[in-house]
């Protein structure tokens, strides 16, 4: 019984990693998968090198559609690989558990890939490598046992479990290192998973956990705030100085493919969302996330026949029948869509303008909101948020005149108007609701910020001002999300 203790400990540590630390990533990985038993539906995989093996590994990925089941499933596989590796190495009891270094290397590789794990490669590679090494180590163990007999000797004296201690150390470091170096990836995947179940509060909490959010986190944070009706009140609660995302140079280095379709959909731009998802399907082959996006977008555009075709294609994938049934009922009875709170919120932002996607600047979800002139109150708020994000004060002034007719101007908007009044004093007369306290607040910020306006080193600015002023448009306008082009202390563009 004692010889199984090292493997039980490894199982616990692998479970912590696969269910907890990296659980959201593996769960999202299942959304980047598509599998069907129909070889025609899987032709995009089968025609690739190792296509048949990837088809099998995509099937073996199916348990990952549940975070706990998938995490425990992976932990068991990794523990088996540990045991098989020990058998292959024919280690003594002192070294039981040292085989965990092999599965740890697979996980280290997965962590090192970052967003590339699903944005730039076959999504089933992790499972593929685990099963490949399981098969290899078991074959080697059998061959070695046939040709070499292990010498047995009584081990009476106590021996430190060196192998187990080494494995515990490497697995603990793996868990800690993954959270430190891949925090943004873990949180953004968790936000995408929560988006599927409309857990807006959970998405907002995740965004606030990030020490230095990337573009994916900022995008999903904006979606959640917009769905909660809090975009103009809380959009600057996170830092917009995005760290670079390391991607393989395949079809460009832009990480926006991770969130563009969702941003378009939740801006009530179903045609651009559909178009983007379709392009990704053509380039990468069918993926569950984009396939569901195309179903929702075609349904919102009342393309019932097209939606039915996609539903039939999705129904070939195991465990997706519930989603298929839901949208089949909605096609038969559109009122069901109108009663879905998520869809209701999306449709509240419907455009009154007829235009083409190319009529607006890219990305469309920002370009449309900057360019739209006739819109619902909810679209007006999203449009104002886009103007604030882009530091477009002319657009802020134009939209504020309409926004004040339906609600009190939010703090961020008032700050932007006071900033604009430095060059156009008449703005303060146009918006008498701007209080003296707001003017004093802006003046106080100007006094504290003036020594740093010409400074390119943002780290010193961050330390001096962010704690007090970070959650404000004032800090964002002068110091946040700025590119290298700065003229007279004013930011000329954003990321």
Task: Locate each region found by the language model.
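Hydrophobic cores of alpha-helical transmembrane segments in multi-pass inner/ER membrane proteins
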Residues: 75-80, 131-149
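Aromatic-anchored segments of alpha-helical transmembrane domains
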Residues: 15-19, 101-113, 169-176
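Internal/C-terminal transmembrane anchor helices
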Residues: 157-182
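Juxtamembrane "helix-exit" motif on the non-cytosolic side of transmembrane helices
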Residues: 22-30, 108-122
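Soluble catalytic regions of membrane-associated enzymes that act on cell-envelope
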Residues: 182-355, 363, 368-392
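Transmembrane-helix motifs of polytopic, lipid-linked glycan transferases
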Residues: 75-93, 107-111, 141
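Membrane-interface coil-to-helix junctions
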Residues: 17-60, 64-69
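N-terminal membrane topogenic signal
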Residues: 1-11, 93-95
